[in-house]
């Protein structure tokens, strides 16, 4: 199975979701000066920012990570977290990334997710990678 890459703000909601998920994952650093580069296909798990608008929905650190052409080329799907209080903008970062990068938006969950979200993502990620061609 390929990996998960995620970003978590200082609230650590996404970090807690990843820990409960129990799958291999690499964190995009909170410090914008630190960089990572991935070397295998991955699914991105990202929180949504901005209080409901498109502008600012994707964290700057994630934009910087995806601006690296090598990292962007290995992206295979996106999972977004958000806050249902933002209505239609709930999980907006997933919409933005999926559309701009041409990858499927696989799932969204609220804040740090429920046990049902954990089970759905674990199962969905496994099934997603099983459907992918070997050299994808």
UniProtKB/Swiss-Prot annotation:
InterPro entries: Flavoprotein-like_sf (IPR029039), RNR_Ib_NrdI_bac (IPR020852), RNR_NrdI (IPR004465). One of its GO terms (molecular function) is FMN binding. GO terms for biological process: protein modification process. Pfam families: Flavodoxin_NdrI (PF07972). Probably involved in ribonucleotide reductase function. NCBIfam families: nrdI (TIGR00333). HAMAP family: NrdI. Belongs to the NrdI family. This is Protein NrdI. The lineage of its organism: Bacteria, Pseudomonadati, Pseudomonadota, Gammaproteobacteria, Enterobacterales. The gene is nrdI.
């Amino acid at each position: 199975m390929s990996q998960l890459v995620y970003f978590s703000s200082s609230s650590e909601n996404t970090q807690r979701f990843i820990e409960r998920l129990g799958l291999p994952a690499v964190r995009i650093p909170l410090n914008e000066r630190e960089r990572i580069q991935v070397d295998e296909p991955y699914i991105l798990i990202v929180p949504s920012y901005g209080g409901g608008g498109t502008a600012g929905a994707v964290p700057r650190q994630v934009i910087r990570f995806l601006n690296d052409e090598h990292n962007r080329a290995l992206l295979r799907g996106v999972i977004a977290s958000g806050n249902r209080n933002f209505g239609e903008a709930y999980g907006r970062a997933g919409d933005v990334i999926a559309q701009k990068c041409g990858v499927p938006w696989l799932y969204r969950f609220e804040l740090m997710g429920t046990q049902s979200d954990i089970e759905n993502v674990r199962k969905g990620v496994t099934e997603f990678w099983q459907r992918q061609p070997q050299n994808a």
